Design a protein with these regions (language model features):
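A short acidic-to-branched-hydrophobic micro-motif
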Residues: 39-58
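A short local loop/turn or secondary-structure capping micro-motif enriched for an aromatic residue
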Residues: 48-49, 60-61, 103-106
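Ampiphathic alpha-helical segments that act as solvent-exposed interaction surfaces
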Residues: 68-78, 99-132
Length: 145
């Protein structure tokens, strides 16, 4: 098993979730966390990189939210790596992802990333109804930690 699989399985057990990553690194594990987002565990075999992705569940993603996310891509540092936002064109949906080399990956990355993903999903829900400030006006480290 890769570092990624071992760490992901340990993390899932720690939050009382039973879905486990299999030995097949080609697959992805998608966990619907709440109505706003899903967490995706994936692995890029070509670069031996672990991919932690937050997917926003509404399709298409609200344009105000997309604009904020894309304008602020690469501005959030989580667990020593950039949280990069992007757009899946086929579904007009946004995502955020962190890519970490498998050789560096351990369960502490997941423990640091998961709460940030939860906060991003809460912010996302607030922006959709006009209740959240724009990301650009915030102190990012304080906003997400």
């Amino acid at each position: 098993m890769s570092n990624f699989q071992t760490a992901a399985n340990e993390f899932l057990e720690s939050i009382d979730l039973s879905p486990m990553l299999e030995d097949d690194l080609d697959g992805e594990l998608v966990l619907e966390i709440n109505q706003n987002f899903s967490l995706v565990f994936g692995f890029d075999q070509t670069t031996e990189t672990c991919v932690l992705r937050i997917l926003f569940n509404d399709l298409p993603t609200d344009t105000r939210v997309l604009t904020e996310l894309l304008q602020n891509s690469n501005t959030l540092d989580v667990a020593g790596y950039n949280l990069t936002f992007g757009l899946e064109v086929a579904h007009s949906s946004a995502y955020g992802e962190i890519r970490i080399p498998d050789s560096d990956f351990d369960v502490t990355h997941l423990r640091q990333v998961f709460p940030v993903f939860l906060q991003v999903s809460e912010w996302y829900a607030e922006v959709k109804v006009g209740a959240a400030p724009e990301l650009s006006s915030q102190n990012h480290p304080q906003m997400w930690m």
